[in-house]
Amino acid sequence: MSKTIAINAGSSSLKWQLYQMPEEAVLAQGIIERIGLKDSISTVKYDGKKEEQILDIHDHTEAVKILLNDLIHFGIIAAYDEITGVGHRVVAGGELFKESVVVNDKVLEHIEELSVLAPLHNPGAAAGIRAFRDILPDITSVCVFDTSFHTSMAKHTYLYPIPQKYYTDYKVRKYGAHGTSHKYVAQEAAKMLGRPLEELKLITAHIGNGVSITANYHGKSVDTSMGFTPLAGPMMGTRSGDIDPAIIPYLIEQDPELKDAADVVNMLNKKSGLSGVSGISSDMRDIEAGLQEDNPDAVLAYNIFIDRIKKCIGQYFAVLNGADALVFTAGMGENAPLMRQDVIGGLTWFGMDIDPEKNVFGYRGDISTPESKVKVLVISTDEELCIARDVERLKNTK
């Protein structure tokens, strides 16, 4: 028996989950927020308890020290050496990493170089990796890449219709993201349907603050909505999703607050989507509250959101030439029944129908009617468990 930590590190946060392996039992979980800012928050959940402390945490190394000390302080572990592995979620692996790998200096260097593909994610992941290597240098450290699952896409799918020199010289192509989540829920869908994954055509919809949809053919990703970066695809919480690229130079010319392309991309990443259109929030719960109040901006944001998701799902029916099931997962996918109802309501032509008694908050499983030709499933994603499993698998390959 051993203990493994799954880590999802951002620029100012560190989310973690501690497992007893190979039993896959969750021993504790938590998050450290506002790293590098005043009044950082460290939250630990274990044995039905929740402990929270506010303190100043200056960097990721300090955050990891506090996390490990908390595990000892709360009696979750007796000593550091009980932890034998750590797995790190890394958003962008580019073409270099087609599967999870054990960390070494070269791997870490590549992750930092690939930050251009995920500027909001990879730098934080690299900081988390460095912190654990500094404090626990002897344990197995593994990187699990969001992009790995999508390396099965065909060249005609991942290339953009621009001169090929931009791919050969600069590696401009579709990479996708959320691959760990899409892979996991596809496997769970096969179990739920009682059929081999290798026989199924699935559309998996990861709908959280970030949104990505994937066409899964016989267990492999054949297309996905996120692209060169996680900015592409349907509308998201704070991200615009797909827009006409000519808008970028136009806005630079017209708006004095947007001085260059970086300013526009920052706006598209952090100030757009549900939040930007509604002027209220990136949280679907707040948007739905706005619907109840007949707030016109909330209504508009919601309608754009539903429209973009329906269009993306619809195109993947064409990519797969039909599908056996549609899977909803992640924060909104799992917990927003109104959103699911309105998405499916625009896709009934494909033979989908949901049971309103099952399409309720908190329900997991098959929410379609017996007559539905395409099954509609709600499955909780578990990226942390996937990460812990890969650590366990790779422990003896250092």
UniProtKB/Swiss-Prot annotation:
Pfam families: Acetate_kinase. Belongs to the acetokinase family. This is Acetate kinase. GO terms for biological process: acetate metabolic process; acetyl-CoA biosynthetic process. Mg(2+) binds at N8, E383. It is found in: Cytoplasm. Keywords: ATP-binding, Cytoplasm, Kinase, Magnesium, Metal-binding, Nucleotide-binding, Transferase. Disulfide bonds: none annotated. Mg(2+). Can also accept Mn(2+). It catalyses: acetate + ATP = acetyl phosphate + ADP. Its EC number is 2.7.2.1. The keyword ATP-binding applies. ATP binds at K15, H206, I207, G208, N209, G210, D283, M284, R285, G331, M332, G333, E334, N335.
